[in-house]
């Protein structure tokens, strides 16, 4: 069995986690107390959903997930919420005092005390797996817990489970909308360790998802629940191939192989289509070619960056629902003819497609329409460097005056870490620049070589 363990860190991670598990339960017909009426084989672990749920002797299904936060409010909501019977109480870990938007608190002082407990719980989950394939880590890098404790945990996971792949769903700070003044510090420090310790990181940002819900779902003032449910659909689409059967199934490590040309260049853009309200869906066809074109629209990106400013290096299209390979091939052929979608010249094919026959599920009373087919795209594009450039610029403005730095130093960090992390990101921007640069200027010398 190819199990995956989900780790939800900090407020963002836990709240996105809530939306995801709500959706996973609906998709598999698992009730909030973990019972699954449709599952006839009690205790048999070969069903596809066992990648995400472990089954107890009593026939109860328990998510392979850990929720951790340094302050209790968010985790307490899960402990008292609708799904309180679903999770094992030991999987919900919370501390007493929060990281106060401070990376150093999450990483050094307060995170240090809780991280061993977390690893212990993760170890128990891992021991329950017959063939663990990797971890899905959900966190935000703007706050203190998601960035600090998230980075610490990833570092420790690299030590304990070196070969297992780690996929991150990471909420990055938005260009205009901000929840904390020190976001640029936290994100730069956290990205510094994400570069080393994650294999693929899907970048999300609230502002882009706000705009998406406002434009397509006619919600005037989207709440975090609206946003998280949309993120839930994306996560579900990416992991559908682990949990259901389909024509072209995709493994966790397969994402890595197809999306990451160089180890450091592993930050990917995600889009999902169709994001459409029930009123509109009534009048639309939403054919395979339509939704395939929609995921390449700059407006449907889940991160505020314009893919037309960069080049694609690789691209995965995960279809689900009523889709046949013939339609997919036709849609991809059409996309390739478009001039707006440019690939780097060293990546000629560039597309990986997955098809899964399970149609997308919607949360009852949610905003999304029930549709026959959907597609989720994950793309590695050089345009993502815009996101880093933006954060780095804000970091520089604050750091040039050493504003707020004493809060970090007071928690046991050294100023050198700031400049080290910043240099690492400068190198990353440079890497993206080089990858996207035309390799035409090299061709002159290479013609001489005989093969």
UniProtKB/Swiss-Prot annotation:
Undergoes a tyrosination/detyrosination cycle, the cyclic removal and re-addition of a C-terminal tyrosine residue by the enzymes tubulin tyrosine carboxypeptidase (TTCP) and tubulin tyrosine ligase (TTL), respectively. The modification N6-acetyllysine is found at residue 40. It comes from the Eukaryota. This is Tubulin alpha chain. One of its GO terms (molecular function) is metal ion binding. It holds the Pfam family Tubulin_C. It comes from Trypanosoma cruzi. The record marks 451 as: Involved in polymerization. Signal peptide: none annotated. Belongs to the tubulin family. It catalyses: GTP + H2O = GDP + phosphate + H(+). Dimer of alpha and beta chains. A typical microtubule is a hollow water-filled tube with an outer diameter of 25 nm and an inner diameter of 15 nM. Alpha-beta heterodimers associate head-to-tail to form protofilaments running lengthwise along the microtubule wall with the beta-tubulin subunit facing the microtubule plus end conferring a structural polarity. Microtubules usually have 13 protofilaments but different protofilament numbers can be found in some organisms and specialized cells. One of its GO terms (biological process) is microtubule-based process. InterPro entries: Alpha_tubulin, Tub_FtsZ_C, Tubulin, Tubulin/FtsZ-like_C, Tubulin/FtsZ_2-layer-sand-dom, Tubulin/FtsZ_GTPase_sf, Tubulin_C, Tubulin_CS. GTP binds at residues 11, 71, 144-145, 179, 206, 228. Its EC number is 3.6.5.-. Mg(2+) binds at residue 71. Its cofactor is Mg(2+). The active site is at residue 254.
């Amino acid at each position: 069995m190819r199990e995956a363990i989900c780790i939800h860190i900090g407020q963002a991670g836990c709240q996105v986690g809530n939306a995801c598990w709500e959706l996973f339960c609906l998709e598999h017909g698992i009730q909030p107390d973990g019972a699954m009426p449709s599952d006839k084989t009690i205790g048999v672990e070969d069903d596809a959903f066992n990648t995400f749920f472990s089954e107890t002797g009593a026939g109860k299904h328990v998510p392979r997930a850990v929720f951790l936060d340094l302050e209790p409010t968010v985790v307490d909501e899960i402990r008292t919420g609708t799904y309180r019977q679903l999770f094992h109480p030991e999987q919900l870990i919370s501390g007493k005092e929060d990281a106060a938007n401070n990376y150093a608190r999450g990483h050094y002082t307060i995170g240090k005390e809780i991280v061993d407990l977390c690893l212990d719980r993760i170890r128990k989950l891992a021991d329950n797996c017959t063939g663990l394939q990797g971890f899905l880590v959900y966190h935000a890098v703007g706050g203190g817990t998601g960035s600090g404790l998230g980075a610490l945990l990833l570092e420790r996971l690299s030590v304990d489970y070196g070969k297992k792949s780690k996929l991150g769903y990471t909420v990055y700070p938005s260009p205009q909308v901000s929840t904390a003044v020190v976001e640029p510090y936290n994100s730069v420090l956290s990205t510094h360790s994400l570069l080393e310790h994650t294999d693929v990181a899907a970048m999300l940002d609230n502002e882009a998802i706000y705009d998406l819900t406002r434009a397509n779902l006619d919600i005037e003032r989207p709440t975090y629940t609206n946003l998280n449910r949309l993120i839930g659909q994306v996560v579900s689409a990416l992991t559908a191939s682990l949990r259901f059967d389909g024509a072209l199934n995709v493994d966790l490590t397969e994402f890595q192989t197809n999306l990451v040309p160089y180890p450091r260049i592993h930050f990917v853009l995600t889009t999902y289509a169709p994001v459409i309200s029930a009123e509109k869906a009534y009048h639309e066809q939403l054919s395979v070619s339509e939704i395939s074109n929609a995921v390449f629209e700059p407006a449907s990106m889940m991160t505020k960056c314009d893919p037309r400013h960069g080049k694609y290096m690789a691209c995965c299209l995960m279809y689900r629902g009523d889709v046949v390979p013939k339609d997919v091939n036709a849609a991809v052929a059409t996309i390739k003819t478009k001039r707006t979608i440019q690939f780097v010249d060293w990546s000629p094919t560039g597309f990986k497609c997955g098809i899964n026959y399970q149609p997308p599920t919607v949360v009852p009373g949610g905003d999304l329409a029930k549709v026959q087919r959907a597609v989720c795209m994950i793309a590695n594009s050089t345009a993502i460097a815009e996101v880093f450039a933006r954060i780095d610029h804000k970091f520089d403005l604050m750091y040039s005056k050493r504003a707020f730095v004493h809060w970090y130093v007071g928690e046991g960090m050294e100023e050198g870490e700031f400049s080290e992390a910043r240099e690492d990101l400068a190198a990353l921007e440079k890497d993206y620049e080089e990858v996207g640069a035309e390799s035409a200027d090299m061709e002159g010398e290479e013609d001489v070589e005989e093969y």
